[in-house]
Amino acid sequence: MREVMLSECMNLLYESNFVISKPFGRSCFDLIAKKADLKLLIKILKNIDSLSTEQSEELLNIARILQAVPLIIGSRTRNSVMEEGAVYERFGIKAVTFLTFQEQVRGIPPVVYANRGGFFVNIDGKALKETREKLNISVGELAEFSRVSRKTIYKYEQNEANPSAEVAIKIEEYLDVPLIKGINITDYFEGVNLPKSREEAFEKILKEGEDFKVKVIEILGDMGFNLLETTKAPFDAVAEESKNKGDEVHNVLFTNIQETENEEIRKKAIIVDEISKIFNSHSLLILETRKNEDKKIMSMSIRELEKMGDTVDLIDFIEKRKKSKDI
């Protein structure tokens, strides 16, 4: 079932002119997709409740740095089959069925979202109040017809509460005006979580006995990068260099950090390089000692890294090396 959804999703994105990555295994996301300014990090799950807290935190944090939208595509929750056309949420990440996602990609957003107590919709509170007053309908009259309290109608008008789908339809019928608003599941948002502090990241890596990785991350941090260490992604860390405060233009560096190089690590580095190209960013494999020059991989020894002064020096070095290697 999951493999079918993954295949369907890839076909849909390809047909809709997205640039897409190859699927990833054992990662907090399965697909990366980009079209113009829209960037998606997609996780495919049969049961959306199988997403772990650790996976969700990492997915949110990676999405924040990449200015991308994290999205779960699934078919059921722990207790029931997911409703078509409804938006669910897990750990602050929107979750929908494949068909709902397909409709969104084709320009038809869902209007219903699942929450405790049932299914609800977003309505235009200002339009509700203006229409009610224009038609000279009292709050009490509308409340009685909709079978909710006067206080609830006031909350709808102030956009302090949203009605159930059933109540919203009643209000629309009574006022004869469209009020329900679509939910754009691909809207960019600032991630709910923030990257862990360097101290927290170091503590976690040290527990796993990865002193070399700690040393590299510390060097990158001292250079001025905003770092996110990852355990559920194809890369070991993603580093962000903001050119100016509040500037939307920034450099992102995907890094793989390994003491020794082998065929498996090279394959992983090539995959990460493909990711970097989708985001028009950079990738770098950092090794204890760089032995062989590989045209397909941008690599650097830790000694070379230590010679870099700051983020600008490193990015310039990578860009010059890219031109000389023609990659």
From Swiss-Prot:
One of its GO terms (molecular function) is DNA-binding transcription factor activity. HAMAP family: HTH_type_cro_C1. It comes from Methanococcus vannielii (strain ATCC 35089 / DSM 1224 / JCM 13029 / OCM 148 / SB). Residues 128-189 form the HTH cro/C1-type domain. It comes from the Archaea. Residues 139-158 bind DNA. This is Putative HTH-type transcriptional regulatory protein Mevan_1514. NCBIfam families: PRK04140.1 (NF003162). CDD domains: HTH_XRE. Keywords: DNA-binding, Transcription, Transcription regulation. InterPro entries: Arc_TR_HTH, Cro/C1-type_HTH, Lambda_DNA-bd_dom_sf. The keyword Repressor does not apply.
